[in-house]
Protein backbone atom coordinates (compact mmCIF):
# COMPACT_ATOMS: atom_id res chain seq x y z
CA UNK A 1 0.00 0.00 0.00
CA UNK A 2 1.12 3.58 -0.61
CA UNK A 3 1.06 6.34 2.00
CA UNK A 4 1.31 10.08 1.46
CA UNK A 5 3.39 11.91 4.04
CA UNK A 6 2.80 15.66 4.29
CA UNK A 7 5.33 17.84 6.06
CA UNK A 8 4.37 21.43 6.89
CA UNK A 9 6.95 23.82 8.28
CA UNK A 10 6.50 25.17 11.76
CA UNK A 11 7.69 28.66 12.71
CA UNK A 12 10.62 26.92 14.44
CA UNK A 13 11.86 25.42 11.12
CA UNK A 14 15.66 25.34 10.92
CA UNK A 15 17.57 25.05 7.65
CA UNK A 16 20.29 22.98 9.35
CA UNK A 17 17.86 20.04 9.68
CA UNK A 18 17.35 19.82 5.91
CA UNK A 19 20.50 17.73 5.30
CA UNK A 20 19.45 15.21 7.95
CA UNK A 21 15.98 15.06 6.36
CA UNK A 22 17.51 14.40 2.91
CA UNK A 23 19.75 11.67 4.38
CA UNK A 24 16.65 10.12 5.98
CA UNK A 25 14.89 10.10 2.60
CA UNK A 26 17.98 8.56 0.97
CA UNK A 27 17.89 5.72 3.53
CA UNK A 28 14.19 5.14 2.84
CA UNK A 29 14.90 5.08 -0.91
CA UNK A 30 17.77 2.60 -0.46
CA UNK A 31 15.45 0.36 1.59
CA UNK A 32 12.84 0.44 -1.19
CA UNK A 33 10.28 2.29 0.96
CA UNK A 34 10.37 5.70 -0.77
CA UNK A 35 8.49 6.14 -4.06
CA UNK A 36 8.82 9.91 -4.57
CA UNK A 37 9.57 13.06 -2.60
CA UNK A 38 9.81 16.79 -3.05
CA UNK A 39 9.23 20.23 -1.60
CA UNK A 40 6.27 22.49 -2.24
CA UNK A 41 7.21 25.39 -4.52
CA UNK A 42 6.00 27.91 -1.93
CA UNK A 43 8.55 26.45 0.55
CA UNK A 44 5.82 25.78 3.13
CA UNK A 45 6.79 22.12 3.38
CA UNK A 46 6.79 19.06 1.18
CA UNK A 47 5.50 15.56 0.64
CA UNK A 48 6.75 12.06 0.08
CA UNK A 49 5.18 8.74 -0.81
CA UNK A 50 6.05 5.60 1.14
CA UNK A 51 5.26 1.96 0.60
CA UNK A 52 4.53 0.05 3.79
CA UNK A 53 2.50 -2.90 5.03
CA UNK A 54 0.12 -0.77 7.10
CA UNK A 55 -0.74 2.77 8.12
CA UNK A 56 0.90 2.15 11.49
CA UNK A 57 4.11 0.98 9.79
CA UNK A 58 4.12 4.05 7.54
CA UNK A 59 3.59 6.34 10.54
CA UNK A 60 6.42 4.61 12.39
CA UNK A 61 8.75 5.32 9.47
CA UNK A 62 7.60 8.92 8.95
CA UNK A 63 7.89 9.81 12.62
CA UNK A 64 11.62 9.04 12.40
CA UNK A 65 12.00 11.98 9.99
CA UNK A 66 14.38 14.55 11.49
CA UNK A 67 11.87 17.26 10.55
CA UNK A 68 9.51 15.66 13.08
CA UNK A 69 12.13 14.69 15.65
CA UNK A 70 13.52 18.24 15.72
CA UNK A 71 10.00 19.75 15.77
CA UNK A 72 10.69 21.71 12.59
CA UNK A 73 7.61 20.45 10.73
CA UNK A 74 4.34 18.73 11.40
CA UNK A 75 4.24 15.29 9.78
CA UNK A 76 0.94 13.73 8.76
CA UNK A 77 0.54 10.31 7.12
CA UNK A 78 -2.43 9.39 4.92
CA UNK A 79 -3.29 6.08 3.29
CA UNK A 80 -3.32 6.91 -0.40
CA UNK A 81 -5.00 5.09 -3.26
CA UNK A 82 -2.52 6.39 -5.84
CA UNK A 83 -2.97 5.31 -9.43
Predicted stretch roles:
Residues 1-83:
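Conserved, structured core segments of small domains
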Amino acid sequence: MKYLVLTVRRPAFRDDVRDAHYAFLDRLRAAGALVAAGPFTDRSGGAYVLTADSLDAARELALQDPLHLERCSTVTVHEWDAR
